């Protein structure tokens, strides 16, 4: 709509930031090399500068905290205190619903409900304007909002409107905000206090991870998870695209009680991995399953082989780049193309390159470049004829599990899904591979497959927040974005590096990933490591602007000063507050 009104810059600024979930896991003391509990976490956000996070150590007579904080949020969001380590990852459940409302053409503020007509609430919001004054002919903005029983109206004509229900609106009494929940976590010393601090949290749901100095681990889901009227629906957690507001179908009737949310203390496995489906199978979760499955497999292998991993192994796992669909893609290509004479020598050379590939998406791999181009070509050729280019772009950018569609296509070989110009699955694979090779060839500007590198196509640009709201100024102020950085991985690897699927110059550009990594071993206060993408400072001329980038790229995390000895050793400056 903003594009239609010729405000493309504003549309870009208000568009949802990329990034799907985060990685997080805890390991109990019985499984670790140090005999202390581990917490490993990497939070996924858009790659920007300055970074969304800053590292801090806070100490007062009754409390010592260290870890990653966010501007405007008091305390530490992911980190530790003297007794426990804590972190959180987003829980991707449906927390927003849209309702179609019927309004009376004779009485503009009356809308239809299951029991008859009701009056919409009219609210006037005053938006402060800086330097507003009658002297300069400016004043605060007044904006009228209509609100139905479902929530505020987003768009309306004479007889119909769309209302938004969201968990952040109209919270019940005796609930606390996310900032208050984090404050309580910061002061928790054990599992009971950890759970108690989350019990009344209301807002977007998260999975909160726990580890303590006694070797215990746990997790607790918390937040507002709406339960819906099940009339005509498969289950109470499932959302519809657009609910008829006058019927009652899909109305929010309650929130899932805290006692019924998934949690565990010292799980029998000896570890827990966030963002993976647990026992509540009826709750739809918008997940990329491959990353969590890979972490689970690695931890399960350690346990099966009676190996005791240390923090270095956890750091390597955070940077894991194994492509989950590599065996399937290689087998599919070999079966379809290896038995045909319909491809040229150039494509055979590319096929040989991907056949010899080890399945790891390193930045220097030619096989990785071909793999990425192929799976993107497959999903686009399936979706675009049915959805159109624009809607296919929206789907691929908003759905983190699009590669699961590719997996299903390659496994089932269902001819009904093929584009109209294809008659057989084999022919579809051959032409898709040909297009994938062509795309890599154009991106790499080379005719030699052995010279192609995934990192040459897959680069991060740390976009300045100043330019995100005004992309039209990029040609003039693009220097604020800094240099691009080649990376491996993709959206499916543990080292999650999500890239654009849009055709054109932005294709393969890496847009989001782990903007912060944390590793904590609670057996030793000096075994606390954390790394940001760039650095602590937003000043382009500061030595601290990008001094962590090399450590972040090479998976060599930096120590965080928590013990007095390490604090004295690595600190350059200290800010001391007194009561005088």
Spans of features found by a protein language model:
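C-terminal/peripheral segments of proteins
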Residues: 1-580
């Amino acid at each position: 709509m903003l594009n239609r009104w010729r405000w493309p810059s504003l549309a870009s600024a208000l568009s949802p930031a990329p990034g799907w979930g985060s990685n997080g896991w805890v390991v109990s003391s019985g499984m670790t090399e140090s005999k202390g509990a581990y917490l490993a976490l990497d939070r996924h956000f858009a790659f920007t500068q300055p970074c969304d996070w800053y590292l801090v150590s806070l100490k007062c007579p009754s409390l010592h905290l260290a870890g990653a904080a966010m501007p405007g949020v008091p305390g530490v969001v992911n980190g530790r205190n003297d007794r426990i380590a804590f972190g959180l990852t987003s829980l991707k459940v449906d927390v927003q619903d849209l309702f179609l409302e019927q309004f009376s053409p004779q009485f503009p503020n009356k809308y239809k409900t299951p029991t008859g007509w009701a009056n919409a609430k009219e609210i006037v919001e005053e938006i402060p304007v800086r330097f507003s004054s009658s002297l300069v002919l400016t004043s605060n903005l007044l904006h009228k909002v209509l609100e139905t029983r479902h929530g505020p109206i987003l768009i309306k004509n004479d007889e119909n409107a769309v209302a938004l229900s969201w968990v952040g609106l109209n919270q019940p009494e005796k609930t606390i905000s996310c900032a208050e929940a984090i404050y309580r976590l910061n002061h928790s010393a054990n599992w009971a206090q950890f759970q108690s601090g989350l019990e009344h949290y209301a807002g977007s749901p998260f999975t909160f991870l726990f580890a303590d100095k006694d070797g215990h681990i746990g997790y607790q889901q918390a937040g507002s998870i709406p339960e819906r009227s099940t009339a005509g629906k498969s289950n109470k957690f499932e959302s519809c695209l657009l609910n008829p507001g006058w019927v009652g179908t899909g109305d929010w009737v309650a929130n899932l009680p805290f006692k019924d949310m998934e949690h565990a203390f010292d799980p029998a496995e000896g570890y827990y991995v966030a963002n993976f489906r647990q026992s509540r199978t009826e709750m739809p979760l918008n997940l990329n399953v491959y990353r969590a499955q890979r972490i689970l497999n690695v931890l399960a292998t350690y346990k099966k082989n009676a190996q005791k991993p240390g923090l270095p192994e956890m750091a390597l796992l955070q940077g894991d780049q194994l492509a989950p669909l590599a065996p399937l893609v290689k087998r599919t290509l070999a079966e379809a193309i290896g038995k045909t004479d319909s491809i040229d020598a150039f494509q055979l050379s590319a096929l040989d390159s991907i056949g010899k590939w080890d399945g790891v998406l390193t930045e220097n791999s030619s096989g990785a470049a071909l793999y990425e181009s192929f799976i993107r070509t497959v999903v686009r050729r399936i979706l675009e004829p049915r959805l159109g280019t624009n809607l296919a772009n929206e789907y691929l950018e908003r759905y983190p599990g699009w590669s699961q569609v590719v997996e299903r296509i390659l496994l089932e070989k269902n001819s009904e899904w093929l584009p109209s110009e294809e008659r057989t699955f084999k022919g579809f694979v051959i032409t898709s591979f040909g297009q994938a090779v062509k795309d890599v060839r154009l991106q790499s500007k080379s005719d030699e497959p052995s010279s192609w590198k995934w990192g040459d196509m897959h680069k991060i640009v740390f976009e300045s927040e100043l330019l995100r709201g005004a992309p039209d100024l990029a040609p003039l102020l693009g220097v604020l974005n800094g240099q691009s950085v080649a990376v491996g991985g993709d959206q499916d690897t543990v080292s999650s590096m999500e890239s654009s699927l849009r055709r054109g110059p932005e294709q393969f550009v890496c847009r989001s990933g782990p903007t912060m990594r944390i590793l904590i071993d609670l057996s030793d206060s000096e075994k606390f490591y954390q790394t940001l993408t760039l650095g602590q400072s937003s000043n382009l001329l500061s030595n601290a602007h990008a001094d962590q980038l090399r450590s972040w790229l090479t998976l060599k995390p930096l120590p965080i000063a928590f013990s007095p000895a390490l604090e004295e050793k690595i600190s350059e400056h200290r800010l001391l507050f007194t009561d005088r």
